[in-house]
Amino acid sequence: MAKQTPLYDQHVACGARMVDFHGWMMPLHYGSQIDEHHAVRQDAGMFDVSHMTIVDLRGARTREFLRYLLANDVAKLTQPGKALYTGMLNASGGVIDDLIVYFLTEDYFRLVVNSATREKDLAWIEEHAAPYGVALTVRDDLALVAVQGPQAKERAATLFTPEQKSAVEGMKPFFGVQAGDLFIATTGYTGEAGYEIALPKEQVVDFWQKLLAAGVKPAGLGARDTLRLEAGMNLYGQEMDEGVSPLAANMGWTIAWLPEDRQFIGREALEKQREMGTEQLVGLIMTEKGVLRNELPVRFTDEAGQTHEGIITSGSFSPTLGFSIALARVPAGIGEQAIVQIRNREMPVKVTKPGFVRAGKPLTN
């Protein structure tokens, strides 16, 4: 039996088509995925992300523990509330999960991890936390709502108390603050400004209804996927998993190689991969008719005349751009053009950096 978030009845009342998403009944769309996508790019939309797992870590050695557990380095987090994005790797350098970690106090950090990886994440964290005396608290008492879009902050602020408005004033991206009952973070998965707000489950229905009244449009998993794809953001299980190196998933920037004496899980394997070379994640654009779909083959010929093949990890029509885009994992040496096999047709595609739209503006020519 699939689980329900506290907002399940609200989704049904809004006309959602509900689907099983990694064991959770979640809204795919509320009638029009395209309209929901445009609402987030042009105005303000909201997502129920209560299926994600919030984990609080406490203990005197929490920072030391996270410096070992994560590929990025929480030593960078010196200002309370500051967050960073990181991979959590296995010993062979594969990605167990990608997550956000918040520094709250010297003995208190918060992680937000994916729903699909919840059980293995918790088991892995608990196993490695024990020697450090770090205590885990899974915050199943909290719901999580993402409010995203150019008008998102303004609309959300109409629900805030004076204390909460003051707490978020001038807050830069990738920060979080506890203000009253709300944990308000300037993070998201859309390439737009906005907040991800954690609050007690018993308050979330009222909060959702007030956001609706403020003109924030509900958006489902379908729009969430096209928005994150346009923004060039990875989806766990597609761009990366335990068999894929972060170096092959456009996550090299999340690996803190310095200081050289910091040992973290997967470091030794990553150093070998970096020396040997890995596949890479690229963006693809196809302006001709047709749609780039997951798992389609991508072929190119390198400068030496050798033919290579990769695979599309995520592909879709881009509502913002009006043509098809994709992320693809390919061997090194790809140039500016490639071929994608769509049924019996070989379609030319342009190769770009991963990332096509940010803050409503195209990044591509």
Swiss-Prot record:
InterPro entries cross-referenced by the UniProt entry: GCS_T, GCS_T_bac, GCST_C, GCV_T_N, GcvT/YgfZ/DmdA, GcvT/YgfZ_C, TrmE/GcvT_dom1
GO molecular function, a single term: transaminase activity
Gene3D superfamilies the record matches: Aminomethyltransferase beta-barrel domains, Aminomethyltransferase fragment, Probable tRNA modification gtpase trme, domain 1
Presence of keyword Transferase: yes
GO CC annotation: cytosol; glycine cleavage complex
Reaction(s) catalysed by this chain's protein: N(6)-[(R)-S(8)-aminomethyldihydrolipoyl]-L-lysyl-[protein] + (6S)-5,6,7,8-tetrahydrofolate = N(6)-[(R)-dihydrolipoyl]-L-lysyl-[protein] + (6R)-5,10-methylene-5,6,7,8-tetrahydrofolate + NH4(+)
Keywords of the record: Aminotransferase, Transferase
Keyword Transferase: yes
Enzyme Commission number, as recorded: 2.1.2.10
Enzyme class: transferase
Quaternary structure and partners: The glycine cleavage system is composed of four proteins: P, T, L and H.
PANTHER family assigned to the protein according to its UniProt record, in alphabetical order: AMINOMETHYLTRANSFERASE, AMINOMETHYLTRANSFERASE, MITOCHONDRIAL
Protein name per Swiss-Prot or TrEMBL: Aminomethyltransferase
Natural source organism: Serratia proteamaculans (strain 568)
Gene behind the chain: gcvT
